[in-house]
Amino acid sequence: MKKFKKTLMLILAICLIVTSFAGCGGGKDAKSASGENNYGDTYPLNAEGKELSIWSIISVHNKYKSYQDVPFWQEAQKRTGVKLDIEGPTGGQFAESFNLMIASGDLPDIILYDWGYNAHVPGGPDKYIKEKYIIALNDVIDKWAPNLKRELSEDPEMDKAVKTDSGNYYVFPRYEPVTSAWLGPVVRKDWLDDLGLAIPETIEDWHTMLTRFKNEKGSTSPLIYQAGNMKGSGFLSGAFGEMFGFYINDGKIVYGASRPGWKDFLTEMQKWYAEGLIDRDIAAMDSTTMKNKVVSGKNGAFLGSGGMLGTYIPMMKEVDPKAKFAGAPYPVMNKGDRSQFGIHTLSYPGEMSSAISAECDDVELAAKFLDYFYTEEGQLFANFGIEGVTYNMVDGYPKLSDMVINSDDINSTIDEYAISEFSIIDPRYYEQRMVFPEQKEAIKIWGETDAGKHKLPLLLPTEEESDIMAKYTTEVNTFAEEMYIKYLIGAESLESFDSYVDKLYELGLQTVLDTYQTIYERYLNR
């Protein structure tokens, strides 16, 4: 079994910087140990003297010098009975390090990477299987991964999501069967109470609220958001039946920023901006600027995440002890409507999942090691760490221990002992990482949408399709983003909207739409 002892620094010394795989040779044929049950079926495995090498996109926890020092990796070896040799990228240069590793031909047994994310794996996983960098896992799962196989058979959507259009399984996935809406509108609840207003539901409610915040609460920044989050969620624009980018509408892929509803949305937002209801710095809003404005006490509403709330709540208490935040539903046009847009996280976004390389000498051992994390015990370990240390079972619920709860950073402490990317993400994983009840309530409210009906699934374009998308999509999006700001602040009249749409098509929008549709239909036929 290949030990993968060369470090990334050595690879850097022998390889030129690689940005594509042109000219790179494929790996060897996949190999497995003789026999079909060399290590038993229970954990820890009977694997004394055996070792697996892993390249992990997940960096070493910042508290430790090496992977071998991290409690999770130590415990993983103990529980599975498999010794591990673990390496990964340094300095956050994971894509560059991955490309260098692939180009070198010196591959570890297991590669934890963004295998379904086209920007990081151009041409998709089938290309890497064909060129013998990783192996198809169909037979491997049947032979040596009964726990993952059970999960796939019980969840048809998971089964569909984690294989290629040609039917190849390619990873042991990080999968989240129950997803949460991590982003949504937040309002100053104490201001609403002072003014006798309810949590806003409609666009009209929002206009009334923001106007009164400005006029009666002296808000100099009634509404703020980061443009990327607004466009990705359909915040406000969803009330007009649109969101910025590509989405599914009655089985067809459409581009929201080219449609009539987008013009209606821009018309209303231009009015709000002129009335001083949207922050004047909206075009250049970044996370730091947004935080400073929110905690200044002069902001009335923002589009934010549960994590932001966890940061802002204690900071605001120092500015104004009476300040209260509350999550609000995504705005609709008419009271009683259900928002069609919002944040919907894919159960399998294609990120941080484990492939077995074609250089692996012992596929059985690699598969059985990875399959541990789909056992009931393995899932608890991957999500919550070590029972009695980081969590305790209380009436069947894995409750985080006092050691974790009382630490300076709950998330960082858990991450020393648990790496959920190896497994099925337990919804209780996120529940306990939120400190304040406002966070939990907001996420529940934000999830009351039909965003999942419109969200594109994880699509796997071919290499040719990837080239087409790269050629046209950036120009289309860049132009649409520039015009969004111009229309919003009144620098461009909406009388030019038809010409703007024509320009989008000149830049290749129809080609992109046709390509998306082809890929989407392949996905449906998996």
Regions found by a protein language model. Give the residues of each.
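N-terminal secretory signal peptides that target proteins for export/translocation
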Residues: 1-3
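Helix-loop-helix "hinge/cap" segment bordering the ligand-binding cleft or interdomain interface
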Residues: 138, 164-231, 247-305, 354-365, ...
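C-terminal motif of bacterial Sec signal peptides marking the signal peptidase cleavage site
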Residues: 19-23
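A ligand-binding cleft/hinge motif common to bilobed small-molecule-binding domains
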Residues: 118-128, 306-319
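Conserved N-terminal structural module of periplasmic/extracytoplasmic solute-binding proteins
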Residues: 6-9, 24-205, 234-235, 244, ...
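Conserved small-residue motifs centered on glycine
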Residues: 368-486, 491
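General small-molecule cofactor/ligand-binding pocket signal
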Residues: 83-89, 280-281, 326-328
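Extracytoplasmic/periplasmic substrate-binding proteins
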Residues: 58-71, 179-186, 191-199, 228-278, ...
